[in-house]
């Protein structure tokens, strides 16, 4: 049976569900960076990524650069990577996109996770240097994933259906706003044509039509047509309504409040929901491993 959260030696959770659901758990760390990897899971995959980023770090250190400090905020909604001073979000890794998380058993400060980028759909490996709490951070990410997955299952699709309805209504509102703009443009054109038609030629001596006190041509309704009686003396049948869709004088379909419910969900949002479900099904693997025999030297 596929489990959402998998660790070889499960440990009891260290945070309450409320802390991760209603708030977040903060951690301070130093960010070695991220690099693209070929696979969403695998110990060897993250080992290669850690070695690569450590090598890049040694080069930057020789140039006098320091590791940037970051703040991690872990909750059931994801792992945020922020600037500790300005609180500006640098990365926002959603939990269903995180597929692998590991901490180094020889170097207690190093931990890493693999997350699928939301724009490029590439798998990126993030590597951090923490204050000897790498294992605690990986377990916290695992607990957050476990709670988020359970919440997703307990919703029974209700959250998805609610989002579909909201998305359908938002699309309907957008269509109505677009229709409103087009109607305003057509109305402006008709008003301009009406003004041009009412202005007489410059040298015309033709008699003017009678106007009211506002210098407007008075409205004269047409004489209503009286239906002729049938040959047998009975009243004629009412005119048949056209079967085609009714349209207003601007050629637009009239608003129908009964059709503005949950419309078909836009393909882009539907694909995101499908991807979210697929990510939770893939699960999160958390492992404790040995990345390399050369711990990060001269941390600064």
Swiss-Prot record:
SMART domains: PTB. Keywords: Apoptosis, Coiled coil, Cytoplasm, Phagocytosis, Transport. PROSITE patterns: PID. Disulfide bonds: none annotated. It is found in: Cytoplasm. Residues 160-199 form a coiled coil. GO terms for cellular component: cytoplasm. It holds the Pfam family PID. InterPro entries: Adapter_Engulfment-Domain, PH-like_dom_sf, PTB/PI_dom. It comes from the Eukaryota. The keyword Zinc-finger does not apply. GO terms for biological process: apoptotic process; phagocytosis. Residues 21-176 form the PID domain. Belongs to the ced-6 family. May function as an adapter protein. Required for efficient phagocytosis of apoptotic cells. May play a role in the internalization and endosomal trafficking of various lrp1 ligands. This is PTB domain-containing engulfment adapter protein 1. It comes from Danio rerio (Zebrafish). The lineage of its organism: Eukaryota, Metazoa, Chordata, Craniata, Vertebrata.
């Amino acid at each position: 049976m596929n489990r959402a959260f998998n660790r070889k030696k499960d440990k009891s959770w260290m945070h309450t569900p409320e802390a991760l659901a209603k708030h977040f758990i903060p951690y301070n760390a130093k960010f070695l960076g991220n690099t693209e990897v070929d696979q969403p899971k695998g110990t060897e995959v993250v080992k290669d990524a850690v070695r690569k980023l450590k090598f890049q770090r040694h080069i930057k250190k020789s140039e006098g650069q320091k590791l940037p400090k970051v703040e991690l905020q872990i909750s059931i909604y994801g792992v945020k990577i922020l600037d500790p001073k300005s609180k500006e979000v640098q990365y926002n890794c959603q939990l269903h996109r995180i597929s692998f998380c590991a901490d180094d058993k020889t170097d207690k400060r190093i931990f890493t996770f693999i997350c699928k980028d939301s724009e490029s759909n590439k798998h990126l490996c993030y590597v951090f240097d923490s204050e000897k709490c790498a294992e605690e951070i990986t377990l916290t990410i695992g607990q957050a994933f476990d709670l988020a997955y359970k919440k997703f299952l307990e919703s029974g699709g209700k959250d998805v259906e609610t989002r579909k309805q909201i998305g359908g209504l938002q699309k309907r509102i957008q269509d109505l706003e677009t229709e409103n703009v087009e109607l305003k443009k057509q109305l402006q054109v008709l008003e301009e044509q009406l003004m041009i038609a009412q202005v007489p030629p410059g040298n015309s001596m033709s008699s003017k039509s009678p106007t009211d006190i506002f210098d407007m041509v008075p409205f004269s309704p047409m004489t209503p047509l009286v239906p002729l009686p049938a040959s047998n003396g009975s009243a004629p049948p009412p005119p048949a309504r056209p079967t085609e869709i009714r349209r207003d004088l601007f050629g637009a379909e009239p608003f129908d409040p009964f059709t503005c419910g949950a419309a078909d969900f836009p393909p882009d949002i539907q694909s995101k929901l499908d991807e979210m479900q697929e990510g939770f099904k893939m699960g999160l693997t958390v492992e404790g491993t040995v990345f390399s025999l050369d711990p990060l030297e001269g941390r600064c």
